[in-house]
Structures are given as C-alpha cells and as structure tokens.
Design a protein with these regions (language model features):
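Conserved hydrophobic/aromatic packing and binding residues within compact polymer-binding modules
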Residues: 14, 28-29, 39-42
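Short amphipathic recognition helices of helix-turn-helix/homeodomain-type DNA-binding modules
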Residues: 68-78
Length: 78
C-alpha cells in the first residue's frame, strides 16, 4: 500500500501506534534501519521530513497498525 500523505502528525500518536503494534523502540528502529535512540527522539519530536514519516507509517502498517488523522489523530488495528 502506497501512502501519499503521511498520517503521522504528532509524537503521542507515534508512541501509541508503536505500543499498539507490540513493538519496542528497538524493534521499530530495526524495522526502519535506525537506532532506537532515533525512535526515542521521534517520540518526543515528530519527524518533519515527509519521507521519514511515510517510512514510519509503512513500518507500523506492516505490523498491523494504521494511522489516521480524521476526526482526530490516532492509531487503530489495520
């Protein structure tokens, strides 16, 4: 599934989605080929690069969690 407009809009949404997917910061980092410290950073300050946000969203979707922005930002099982 191609994501055109990233639905990742805030750091709380990222953390909630990661936990819902049953991923640790380390395992999500491994899925994205980044260090777990980068995940911790993104959970405090969301990435502004749309490509990074799309990669994160794809990794979460691959683990069964979809992000959404309407009516409010959140995450749900895909």
């Amino acid at each position: 599934m191609q994501i055109n407009t990233p639905n990742l809009v805030n750091c709380r949404q990222l953390r909630a989605a990661r936990v819902l997917a049953g991923l640790t910061q380390k395992t999500l980092g491994a899925a994205l080929n980044v260090d777990e410290r980068q995940i911790r950073f993104w959970e405090r300050r969301i990435p502004t690069n749309p490509r990074k946000a799309a990669r994160i969203e794809q990794a979460l979707l691959a683990n069964g969690v979809a992000l959404f922005t309407e009516p409010t930002a959140g995450a749900r099982f895909a």
